[in-house]
Amino acid sequence: MGDTALHLVAAPALEATGLQVARGGRPLFRGLGFRLARGGLLCVRGANGSGKTTLLRTLAGLSRPHRGRILRAGRCIRQAANDHRGTLQYRGHRDGLRGALTVLENLQWQAALYHHRPDREAVRTALAGMGMARHLDTLASQLSQGQRRRVVLASLALFPRCRLWLLDEPQAALDVEGAERFHALLARHCQEGGAVVACSHQHLRIGGIPCDELWLSDPAPAGARSAGDRVTGTEA
């Protein structure tokens, strides 16, 4: 009885109902819905131009859907915009690193946007998770694309209050070791009750983490869920 009651009242980390988004007057998707549980991972798949990045920006509150609602822990994000944006981390195609600043300076500057002041050791620890600690004082302009991607992903660990991660092609430019480190970072976040929506050309297989796939391409591959289906994660 008690377990059933808890299951009924537990709000998902993120929920979308009846989303419709268009670009240039052309609908990208309509009737999209999903429920993402705490500790869950939703992998958004689809061809180029299918609307993956647009969906991610809409979930982040950076763009408005033409129809439908997005709920965060049961609250509409339009009615709680500051709380929503202040407790999520969005990583797009562009890394946002300033070439004239060191890795340390870049991450401290980004953290300041969230009124957070990580010290040198905190930044080093975050970078170590992605194998980038030795580049703490390296100028961003001297990093390879793969190294820049590692820095961007490592910075996620600096924001423990941000329980929702929205990631656009997070594995782009990563080598095998970098991908393995990212998977470990992702697993740790989900095991601690965080939730992730990631747009990816590849399925994200993270051991022990429940992962649903949502395809924006029409038609979706056989056996896969399409944008019009309702995707439901396992509640924590």
Curated annotation (Swiss-Prot):
Keywords: ATP-binding, Cell inner membrane, Cell membrane, Cytochrome c-type biogenesis, Membrane, Nucleotide-binding, Translocase, Transport
Subunit structure and binding partners: The complex is composed of two ATP-binding proteins (CcmA) and two transmembrane proteins (CcmB).
SUPFAM superfamilies membership: P-loop containing nucleoside triphosphate hydrolases (SSF52540)
Name this polypeptide is given: Cytochrome c biogenesis ATP-binding export protein CcmA
Reaction(s) catalysed by this chain's protein: heme b(in) + ATP + H2O = heme b(out) + ADP + phosphate + H(+)
Membrane topology: Peripheral membrane protein
Binding site for ATP: 46-53
